[in-house]
């Protein structure tokens, strides 16, 4: 694997342990601009850990993580903060929404410190794209799980990012909401965004241009 201008994330020999338990061992992975990657594997097998390391949300024990064609690995908090703020968006299993706030208030938090001319317009447009613009004034706890997931997707669409990391984005959804989320991911991919999904959903094999399996702390590409 070579670090070229289209490489957004390059992992070299990444190893991660929880205590004495080996989760990931000598992982090599290259994520290039425009990739739609899906990572499969058993529950507890290291998929979410890998995603968190890619997103600089979790440390690793050895190896190197290099981002956006830089020559040197990510080492300090300043680099990690920059990636999280400017380059990477996250879609978590628990949606990471503030339940006692309205949808509008949650959306405003996402762009509070962004230089966006028409924040209200951006919020409305993103919610409309996800089919939840009518929930603007609703409290998050009043929404169904599917609606919360779609709001979480919309929230990611109002902030600038190059890579979207999604942890089981369709795991708890009915078919209708699942297809809305999948269609949104495809649309983002078609717009040039890089998508990395962790999932048990085999439908992603038909969508992703690269699929990987994590097994016994190792990763291999699926054909």
Please provide the spans of the model-predicted regions.
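Catalytic Walker B motif of ABC-type/P-loop ATPase nucleotide-binding domains
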Residues: 164-167
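ABC-type ATPase nucleotide-binding domains, specifically the catalytic core motifs of the NBD
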Residues: 108-120, 129
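Conserved signature/switch motifs of ABC ATPase nucleotide-binding domains
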Residues: 85, 138-141, 159, 191
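Conserved ABC ATPase signature
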Residues: 139-143, 147-149
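Helix-to-loop junction immediately C-terminal to a conserved catalytic motif
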Residues: 55
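Conserved structural motif at the start of ABC-family nucleotide-binding domains
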Residues: 9, 24-26, 83
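ABC ATPase NBD Q-loop/coupling interface
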Residues: 64-82
